Swiss-Prot record:
Designated gene of the protein: rpsZ
Record HAMAP family: Ribosomal_uS14_2_B
Name of the protein in question: Small ribosomal subunit protein uS14B
Cofactor note: Binds 1 zinc ion per subunit.
Subunit text: Part of the 30S ribosomal subunit. Contacts proteins S3 and S10.
Pfam families: Ribosomal_S14
Disulfide bonds listed in the record: none
Length: 61
C-alpha cells in the first residue's frame, strides 16, 4: 500500500510532464499499471477473477 502522502501527491498536477506517473487507484502500486483501467496487474487479475470488470474473461486457447 502506498502512503497517504504519495497518493495525495499523485493527485496533484505535475509541474513538468516527465514527472507524472501512474499509480493503481485501488492499492497505490506505481509499477505495471494498465492505463485503460487505472489498476495494477495484481488488482486487475483479482477483479477479473471475481467478474467485476465487464467484458473481461479468462483466456483459453
Amino acid at each position: 500500500m502506498a502512503k497517504k502522502s504519495q497518493i495525495a501527491k499523485n493527485k496533484r498536477p505535475a509541474k513538468f510532464s516527465t514527472q507524472a506517473y501512474t499509480r493503481c487507484e485501488r492499492c497505490g502500486r506505481p509499477h505495471s499499471v494498465y492505463q485503460k483501467f487505472h489498476l495494477c496487474r495484481i488488482c486487475l487479475r483479482e477483479l477479473a477473477h471475481k467478474g467485476q470488470i465487464p467484458g473481461m474473461k479468462k483466456a483459453s486457447w
